[in-house]
Regions:
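Short coil turns that delineate tetratricopeptide repeat
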Residues: 28-29, 63-64, 98, 102, ...
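Residue-level recognition of tetratricopeptide repeat
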Residues: 5, 40, 75, 113, ...
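TPR alpha-solenoid repeat register
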Residues: 33-34, 69, 103, 107, ...
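Terminal, low-structured helical/coil segments at or just beyond the last alpha-helical repeat
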Residues: 213, 220-256
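Canonical tetratricopeptide repeat
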Residues: 2, 37, 72, 110, ...
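Register position in tetratricopeptide repeats
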Residues: 9, 44, 79, 110-113, ...
Length: 256
């Protein structure tokens, strides 16, 4: 398994697949693990439909679909935008376990994120809060919930305190640093916001949202030429969403 992992991490997918094929014949646990890793390779190769078909067929062939394998499957579906199907699986897990089970906060988080992605915010918020109630020190769950609140323009002071905690738990994480800076921006603490957003853009120089945020805070601090540079840069990033690009085009004309 370790050798296959090394091949996978170095993008040597042909050799990795050969090892996974051998492993798949060594019992159900290896059968599932091999399929999951092969599905990840298909995703890397841009074969999403093939990946989803493989992992779904494998899951359905298992004689025992235990909660850990079901969680793996749900997470894979969520990460590949099959949100409704992942919600069903997370719900299946949550119904089978108690609040003190180690999978409980993870399943609640996973389902909460999936709900948020399909626009079911009330259900998402409830699940994310429930996840943190069961396990309060999950930095990424704190970040997801707090950033969602900030984007909705609610509970910004509370979000800032939560993000300060998340930053203490996971120092130097660019996503958390960006969220922290964005909370300060929304509170009109522009100098403080610039400190964090500059750190975030240094850690994640190709992230569209981080660059957009940094452009905004530069503008508010009077650095308008630099702001336009960062906004323009986002327009050239392949993974920048069209809504973000349209918003930036407006800012390049009108400013903030």
């Amino acid at each position: 398994a370790l050798l296959a992992e090394n091949f996978y991490k170095t993008d040597n997918f042909i050799k990795a697949k050969k090892i996974y094929k051998i492993m798949s014949k060594q019992g159900e646990a290896f059968f599932w693990y091999s399929a999951k890793q092969n599905a990840k390779i298909f995703i890397q190769e841009g074969k999403k439909e093939k990946a989803l078909k493989l992992i779904t067929n494998t899951y359905e062939k298992l004689s025992e679909q235990n909660i850990y394998i079901t969680f793996d499957y749900a997470k894979f579906l969520k990460n590949n935008e099959q949100f409704e199907d992942s919600i069903k699986l997370y719900t299946k897990i949550i119904k089978k376990i108690k609040k003190d089970h180690p999978l409980y906060p993870k399943a609640k988080d996973g389902r909460g994120v999936a709900y948020e992605r399909i626009g079911e915010w009330e259900k998402a918020e409830k699940d994310l809060l429930s996840s943190l109630d069961a396990s309060p020190d999950q930095a990424y769950v704190i970040n997801y919930l707090a950033y969602s609140w900030i984007e909705k323009g609610v509970k910004i002071e509370q979000s800032l305190k939560m993000l300060e905690k998340a930053n203490n738990l996971k120092s130097n994480d660019p996503y958390i640093i960006d969220s922290l800076g964005w909370a300060l921006f929304k509170l009109k603490r522009y100098k403080d916001a610039k400190y964090y957003l500059q750190s975030a853009v240094e850690l994640m120089p190709s992230d569209p949202i981080v660059n957009d945020h940094y452009g905004d805070v530069l503008w508010k601090n009077g650095n308008k030429i630099q702001a336009r540079y960062y906004w323009s840069y986002v327009l050239n990033l392949e993974d920048a969403e069209e809504d973000l690009k349209n918003n930036i085009r407006n800012k390049l004309i009108l400013g903030l």
